[in-house]
Amino acid sequence: MQLNPSEISELIKSRIQGLGESAEIRNQGTVISVSDGICRIHGLSDVMQGEMLEFPGNTFGLALNLERDSVGAVILGEYEHISEGDTVKCTGRILEVPIGPELRGRVVNALGQPIDGKGPVNAKLTAPIEKIAPGVIARQSVDQPMQTGIKAIDAMVPIGRGQRELIIGDRQTGKTAVAIDAIINQKGQNVTCIYVAIGQKASSVKNIVRSLEQHGAMEYTIVVAATASESAAMQFVSAYSGCAMGEYFRDRGEDALIVYDDLSKQAVAYRQVSLLLRRPPGREAFPGDVFYLHSRLLERAARVNADYVEAFTKGEVKGKTGSLTALPIIETQAGDVSAFVPTNVISITDGQIFLETSLFNSGIRPAINAGISVSRVGGAAQTKVIKGLSGGIRTDLAQYRELAAFAQFASDLDASTRKQLDRGARVTELLKQAQYAPLSISLMAVSLFAVNKGYFDDLEVKRVLAFESGLHGFMKSSHAALLQKIEDTKKLEKDDEAVLAAAIADFKKSF
């Protein structure tokens, strides 16, 4: 068989002409080593800091260490199937999570994937988990209240929309209970809540979700859970994911409340990741940028002005300010607030609520230490009626604590000191509150008005809460219009004071 040279050249020409010109450029590398959720990769010359990397088996990672001839990355999720020699691809994107109103009522993991068995989330938008906080010009001062429904907080350490208020205390002092009550109290207030559970037991998260469902709070709440069984990388990323979900509402002129429970565990997870990446350790073996870890997160909680919202939404939303209020939680060891992470977060936030083991064990719950708990910006945001009625309470409590310590050594006390001690004991008793029972502004005003006018002074201490409960029931049944007026106007007029005083006196006769 003879081949004609012209036929060969025609065949080659046709092959060349039919050749597809599409070429795919891909930046990829090879796994050198993998252990403890940390992966070293050779190659990836164009990778970005914080870029999402794609591993085999639809697993993603985060590039954190960019070195001369290798990249250190954390794997987000299971890593048992990844082995040496596997191919890793760059995605060209920073880590993103789904955002939007579709997430309300759902429980998701740190990557925004649903873990509640209710099917896909179907969110239309995604956002990077890291975002630069609004600048000075974009912000507005905090002047709207964020009612928690807890008497001790709303009266003495008020929280405003856009504030960062730290909840700090030892384990088992009721930190989560305070935050959950604050979420339950947002029902009907047009506030979207995000609860970020970091490093908690899955059973604890399940109980919290059940409590929120029982009180009708899940319909406006998103739960982001990175439980203790998940990798350190997922625990450290979860707070930023929750924040990105909250910013969606803030930037569209709505109000949101985010609870980080807790940032101590997030710092420990970040320390674990940093040490495995061989970053140099500093104080308490934390890396040098652990302050920045929390500051860049908490600075994103802010009240933004109408111009910012209008510019962000390209004119769709006009004349509305947005806010993201943060309640970070820190767990201390034996009341040591001077440890590294607690002092960092205290210096970043706009105030703190101290919860004490001794108060909790003596039955004062919520166990708030009024003397050292402060709100640096909330005073300007406090509801007028509560502000007017709560002025004397903080002073009474501070003097009571001082006198109570002194009275232990004194055998005979004069009448005025005895009166102050008796009053302080009743105020302390009144500020006790059951869990999952946040109060409305009007009922809180009734309680504070009654204690200010001395209606509790001649009652036995153990009967104070029973009197308050009965009084609330009496006011709801006989003076509902007055309660509604206080709720609507957020004020207590002189005429209303007289009506309220008469109503309390009337109830007291029958008590």
From Swiss-Prot:
Subunit comment: F-type ATPases have 2 components, CF(1) - the catalytic core - and CF(0) - the membrane proton channel. CF(1) has five subunits: alpha(3), beta(3), gamma(1), delta(1), epsilon(1). CF(0) has three main subunits: a(1), b(2) and c(9-12). The alpha and beta chains form an alternating ring which encloses part of the gamma chain. CF(1) is attached to CF(0) by a central stalk formed by the gamma and epsilon chains, while a peripheral stalk is formed by the delta and b chains.
Pfam families to which the protein is assigned, alphabetical: ATP-synt_ab, ATP-synt_ab_C, ATP-synt_ab_N
Keyword Cell inner membrane: yes
Reaction equation(s) it catalyzes: ATP + H2O + 4 H(+)(in) = ADP + phosphate + 5 H(+)(out)
Membrane topology annotation: Peripheral membrane protein
Protein name: ATP synthase subunit alpha
UniProt-annotated site: Required for activity, residues: S373
HAMAP family hit by this protein: ATP_synth_alpha_bact
Keyword Membrane: yes
Location(s) in or outside the cell: Cell inner membrane
The enzyme's E.C. designation: 7.1.2.2
Similarity comment: family membership: Belongs to the ATPase alpha/beta chains family.
Keywords: ATP synthesis, ATP-binding, Cell inner membrane, Cell membrane, CF(1), Hydrogen ion transport, Ion transport, Membrane, Nucleotide-binding, Translocase, Transport
GO terms assigned for molecular function: ADP binding; ATP binding; proton-transporting ATP synthase activity, rotational mechanism
